């Protein structure tokens, strides 16, 4: 309880010592509440990641996957941040931000959607919405939407046999080219390479493995 309270005292900048204690024992209570960016690898992980615990000086802690990705870290291929419980993005947010997150999850910023249109749907100005997101989440609405697209697409790559064109569309990418460019930039490999890696890792008899 003491560790949880210590983390909660700072919504946007979780207490590093408390977070590292949770990371060192892979405390599942923090899954979805915090993410750790490892500066020596450029990867961000869930606190329950099975990889060897990094040194404290190599860790940066974030309250959301979007904040970690905005800081330049890419998602871990082992613990798969896209499967973490969606707790942190809703904790301590205002009603406007919570509604905005729900609309973003529904695709409000996909395709031709803009932050100005999102703000209008929420009944606030664009600048006010950006300020609220920065205040409560530490990132912009666009950053949240971009992270959601990447993590949702990555989940579909791992957990389905859908063609890449359908995954790009379902995740809200404007084009397959943009989809491929984003994954190449983040993971230094095309989406198809992640699909091959996922298929190899699938246990025999799983739904995705058997088609």
Predicted feature residues:
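Terminal helix-turn-helix DNA-binding modules in bacterial transcription factors
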Residues: 102-106, 112, 116, 135-172, ...
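Mature, structured domains enriched in cysteine- and short glycine motifs
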Residues: 1-103, 112
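Catalytic cores of secreted or luminal carbohydrate-active enzymes
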Residues: 182, 186-205
């Amino acid at each position: 309880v003491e560790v949880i309270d210590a983390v909660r005292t700072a919504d946007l900048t979780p207490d590093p010592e408390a977070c590292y204690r949770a990371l060192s024992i892979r405390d599942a209570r923090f899954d979805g509440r915090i993410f750790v960016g490892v500066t020596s690898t450029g990867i961000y992980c869930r606190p329950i990641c099975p990889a060897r615990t990094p040194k404290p000086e190599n860790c940066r802690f974030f309250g959301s996957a979007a904040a970690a990705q905005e800081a330049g870290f890419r998602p871990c291929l082992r613990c798969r941040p896209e499967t973490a419980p969606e707790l942190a993005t809703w904790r301590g947010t205002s009603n406007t931000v919570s509604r905005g997150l729900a609309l973003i999850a529904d695709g409000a910023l996909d395709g031709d959607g803009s932050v100005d249109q999102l703000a209008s749907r929420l009944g606030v100005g664009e600048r006010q919405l950006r300020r609220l997101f920065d205040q409560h989440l530490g990132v912009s609405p666009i950053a949240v939407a971009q992270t959601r697209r990447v993590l949702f697409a990555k989940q579909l790559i791992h957990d389905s046999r859908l063609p890449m064109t359908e995954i790009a569309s379902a995740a809200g990418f404007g084009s397959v080219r943009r989809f491929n460019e984003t994954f190449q930039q983040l993971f230094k490999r095309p989406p198809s390479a992640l699909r091959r890696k996922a298929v190899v890792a699938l246990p025999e008899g799983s739904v995705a493995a058997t088609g």
